[in-house]
Regions:
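Gram-negative (and chloroplast) outer-membrane scaffold detector with strong preference
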Residues: 23, 34, 39-43, 66-135, ...
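A charged, solvent-exposed segment within the mature domains of Sec-exported extracytoplasmic proteins
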Residues: 121, 131-172
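Outer-membrane beta-barrel translocator domains and adjoining extracellular loop/strand segments
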Residues: 46-53, 87-95, 130-139, 176-184
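N-terminal targeting signals for Sec/Tat export/insertion, comprising classic cleavable signal peptides
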Residues: 30-56
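Hydrophobic secondary-structure block in the mid-to-C-terminal portion of proteins
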Residues: 157-205
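Hydrophobic alpha-helical segments typical of transmembrane helices
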Residues: 63-66, 150
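Cleavable N-terminal export/targeting peptides
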Residues: 1-31
């Protein structure tokens, strides 16, 4: 699914950015603060260092909010806030669930092309793991971690204040997990690397 979605979004953004180069500039056509409210699908690409066993992490749909501050017409910083719950399994063994809180700060570059305004961004996230449930084992412990974020999206103006938003982010996220299986304690390096696809509405503050 990712192999289809990512090239499609990149081609769409490229077409809008080419149009943006030819579009007339309006230096007053931005607000210092913006907020977006999205429904987002969080699609992990899990991996681990266990031989002969693959970890499986569930996809989930969540509400997401971000606040964007524009330094100039084109350059901005975006703080993304959301929390998500995932079920975890290894080869059919239920490892319960865990909640993730990954506040993410991206630096963005916004193109301007009439009512369509594509953007790209990159930044960092700090992921906090909480609310662990151990499932069929004695205990699970997830270590908080720092990772990178890459982003592309499009805003479409509905009027001078409100706009629609399509946003795609790739988080490079991994964690050290300690599995207490009762008779043994197993350290595991787990890659989560979620693709986050969001659709919603924004407002210029």
């Amino acid at each position: 699914m990712k192999k289809i979605i990512i090239p499609f979004v990149l081609l769409l953004l490229l077409s809008f950015s080419v149009q943006a180069q030819d579009a007339p500039s309006n230096d007053s056509d931005f607000n210092t603060w913006q907020a977006r409210f999205r429904v987002a699908a969080v699609i992990p690409s899990p991996g681990d260092n266990l031989e002969g066993a693959d970890v499986d992490i569930s996809t989930t749909v969540i509400p997401e909010v971000d606040f964007t501050y524009f330094f100039t017409k084109h350059w901005a910083a975006e703080l993304i806030l959301a929390t998500t719950k995932h079920e975890v399994e290894v080869e059919g063994l239920d490892l319960g669930h865990v909640w993730l809180l990954p506040p993410t700060l991206n630096v963005q570059y916004h193109f301007y092309s009439g009512d369509f305004k594509p953007y790209v961004g990159a930044g960092v996230n700090y992921t906090i793991f909480y609310g662990e449930d151990a499932g069929d084992v004695v205990g699970m412990d997830y270590e908080n971690s720092v990772g990178f974020s890459f982003q592309a999206g499009i805003d479409y103006n509905l009027n001078d204040k409100w706009f629609l938003n399509l946003d795609v982010k790739q988080l490079l996220l991994s964690t050290d997990v300690t599995v207490n299986a009762g008779e043994a304690v197993i350290p595991v390096e787990v890659d989560i690397n979620p693709l986050i696809i969001g659709l919603g509405i924004g407002v210029k503050l």
